[in-house]
Amino acid sequence: YTGNPYLIEYPDNVMRAKFETTYNLLKEKFGIEVKSHRAGRWAMDDRYFALLKDFGIEADCSHTPGVSWSQAAGETIMGSDYSKVQNYPSFINNILEIPMTIRKTHISRKGSFKHKLRVLLQGDNVWLRPASATADEMLHLCKCIDTEPNVDYLEFMVHSSELMPNGSPYFKDENAIEELYKTIEAVFAYVRQLGYKGITMAEYCRIYKNNN
């Protein structure tokens, strides 16, 4: 193991202190109660869910269905394995886990012929995330999920650093950022046509509890 440590690698007291520092900073800066959470580098365990409960967190979105981080090294462990987790919400220690929108598809409009053939035969995970999927792939993903009976949400992800030129490895200049915003606008326009509307994780959690 040669990577930076995951939060779940630390002893309970250190883990709590680190989380509390971030929690208090966000609460102070935004002036609201923090009710939703995503783990850094997607690493969760039972202790982490218990910690979220202690701080009044209601919703988490750290699970990545069909994706294993077991090749992503921490300092003493590898990353979490979500390859077998369900792709619809469920409660874990009274925290509503709202998995990231990811599905395996067999269509690819980018890459080499060899890559497209592999995706056609084996499938490939497509995220509702511009850093890892094209606009066409995300539109196709949304269309497919809209027909699923157990899922009534789409979870879109973008890091704030990805919204500025060279803030991330994915969008390095002004042109890339312009294309990113066009992609986001296209995806949002399409899902509005499907009947979706933008809400926070905490708002979705309240709706889910009322309906279940």
Q: How would you label these PLM feature ranges?
A:
Residues 17, 21-24, 47, 54, ...:
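Alpha-helical scaffolding segments of alpha/beta enzyme cores, especially the outer helices
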Residues 29, 34, 103-108, 212:
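Charged, low-complexity C-terminal accessory regions
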Residues 32-33, 56-58, 150-152, 195:
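Short loop/turn motifs at secondary-structure junctions
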Residues 34, 93-95, 153:
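Extracellular structured ligand-interaction cores
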Residues 37, 60, 154-156:
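Hydrophobic residues within beta-strands of alpha/beta enzymes
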Residues 39-149:
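Active-site-adjacent pocket scaffolds in enzyme catalytic domains
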Residues 123-212:
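C-terminal domain-boundary segment and adjacent tail
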